[in-house]
Amino acid sequence: MTLEEFSAGEQKTERMDKVGDALEEVLSKALSQRTITVGVYEAAKLLNVDPDNVVLCLLAADEDDDRDVALQIHFTLIQAFCCENDINILRVSNPGRLAELLLLETDAGPAASEGAEQPPDLHCVLVTNPHSSQWKDPALSQLICFCRESRYMDQWVPVINLPER
């Protein structure tokens, strides 16, 4: 391995870490502003009704989910719809970490302790633009820039790994 190859690999890792951190920040803000939709079915409904307000689509699957044909068909349809409507898409390779980020608030609720509720479907997550104001969020801007750069390199659905804490 040459110095240039090592340096390029190190820069790519650092860049991916920054993108992962930006995604965590965007998800945290979206949760607090209630501008997040979770679940393949719920996401499909929202995309059908109001695609113009969706700013980011996350698709999360692990190795086991890659063998789920029905889920892969849903992913393909959602990806096609998002590409057609200029919605930024990211694929998250560690859905467990995504679940940790999204379920922090619901774990404290009474239903979680009773175990009566089925865990939510976290395979698709949409972040919408709040109607009250345009997002002037540097973390969201960084994610949108990353998605745009990935598309320029013919990587239409970039895969990121959320950093473990």
From Swiss-Prot:
SUPFAM superfamilies in UniProt: L30e-like (SSF55315)
Subcellular location: Nucleus
Keywords carried by this UniProt record: Cell cycle, DNA damage, Growth arrest, Nucleus, Phosphoprotein
Induction: By UV irradiation, X-rays, growth arrest and alkylating agents. The induction is mediated by some kinase(s) other than PKC.
Pfam families attached to this UniProt entry: Ribosomal_L7Ae
GO biological process: apoptotic process; cellular response to ionizing radiation; cellular response to mechanical stimulus; centrosome cycle; DNA repair; negative regulation of angiogenesis; negative regulation of blood vessel endothelial cell migration; negative regulation of peptidyl-serine phosphorylation of STAT protein
Gene3D superfamilies recorded: 3.30.1330.30
Main localization (coarse): nucleus
Keyword ATP-binding part of the UniProt annotation: no
Entry GO terms, CC: cytoplasm; nuclear speck; nucleoplasm; nucleus
GO molecular function term, any single one: protein heterodimerization activity
Function: In T-cells, functions as a regulator of p38 MAPKs by inhibiting p88 phosphorylation and activity. Might affect PCNA interaction with some CDK (cell division protein kinase) complexes; stimulates DNA excision repair in vitro and inhibits entry of cells into S phase.
Family in the record: Belongs to the GADD45 family.
Protein name: Growth arrest and DNA damage-inducible protein GADD45 alpha
Gene this chain is encoded by: GADD45A
